[in-house]
Amino acid sequence: MSVMFDPEAAIYPFPPKPLPLNLDEKQFYREKIKRMLKERDAVMVAHYYTDPEIQQLAEETGGCISDSLEMARFGAKHSASTLLVAGVRFMGETAKILSPEKTILMPTLNAECSLDLGCPIEEFSAFCDAHPDRTVVVYANTSAAVKARADWVVTSSIAVELIEHLDSLGQKIIWAPDKHLGNYVQKQTGADVLCWQGACIVHDEFKTQALVRMKALYPEAAILVHPESPQSIVDMADAVGSTSQLINAAKTLPQQKLIVATDRGIFYKMQQAVPEKELFEAPTAGEGATCRSCAHCPWMAMNGLKAIADGLESGGAAHEIHVDAALREGALLPLNRMLEFAATLRS
């Protein structure tokens, strides 16, 4: 594939880890957040990959814990005038696209995503222009500008079904930005898929030989894998799926030990779903101290209690998401196509 930008060669600067809080500080910020959510007529939506204490707070305050699209849909349906989005920036953008009349706040606007960073709109648009015969399908983990350039937006939970549908219509596909998910979808469907070469820095680090060794230690364990992982990891899986699909798989699989190849933030909701089961993180390069993310997104970790309290208290340019009106209209079209398609799958 010939593109000006090479996501595989990109090195993304990681944010510093938030300063740890003591128990008194945590309690102070928890109470402050609860109070300010009420004062601002706000509801908190948190991604599965945020830290457990953030997910717990979302639950306690009547919010939502889910994947990025369901976060946005929950916010759109909720009566609150303000959404506090605990996640990464594209999630706040998606919420604003679906709820333009609401105030969308984030703990920080510097919470990035390697998939988003790895798909700059200028280079991606040029790539699409070079293949005008292909239908452009982009993952939810992209900027509003990239979504606006696409024909379809898709989540991992319906990616296979959507590509099967487009393939049945004789359409050839450009898939972006995640190469591993794109390759997985292509293998599952047999469709003509041209992949952009981005990757999630968390899932890209799962190591095959280390997973083989872990499986040998726990031969009775099932392996659950998110399809953003490399194909060699997917090939070892007993279940492959999106975050919500992996939680469901944890409930339905008979094994009492589960090795989970996705961000360890998912363990909070997964353990709630299967309290009797033992969960293990799939290995990255952590043993050799060469992993960068070590099974937890460093940008998700920016969503700390202090940052959430600051976002609710201060708002403004440092915390509020804005999406240009024309860009919003462009991104809303492929998002609505996906939502309508997803509705047909549920009916």
Swiss-Prot record:
One GO location term (cellular component): cytosol
Assigned keywords, A-Z: 4Fe-4S, Cytoplasm, Iron, Iron-sulfur, Metal-binding, Pyridine nucleotide biosynthesis, Transferase
GO molecular function, one term: 4 iron, 4 sulfur cluster binding
Free-text cofactor note: Binds 1 [4Fe-4S] cluster per subunit.
Binding site for iminosuccinate: H47, S68, Y139, A140, N141, S156, H226, P227, E228, T243
Chief location category: cytoplasm
Co-factor requirement: [4Fe-4S] cluster
Catalytic reactions on record: iminosuccinate + dihydroxyacetone phosphate = quinolinate + phosphate + 2 H2O + H(+)
Subcellular location: Cytoplasm
Pfam families: NadA (PF02445)
One biological process term in Gene Ontology: 'de novo' NAD biosynthetic process from L-aspartate
Residue positions binding [4Fe-4S] cluster: C113, C200, C297
UniProt EC number: 2.5.1.72
Signal sequence range: none
Pathway: Cofactor biosynthesis; NAD(+) biosynthesis; quinolinate from iminoaspartate: step 1/1
Family: Belongs to the quinolinate synthase family. Type 1 subfamily.
Function of the protein: Catalyzes the condensation of iminoaspartate with dihydroxyacetone phosphate to form quinolinate.
Protein name, entry field: Quinolinate synthase
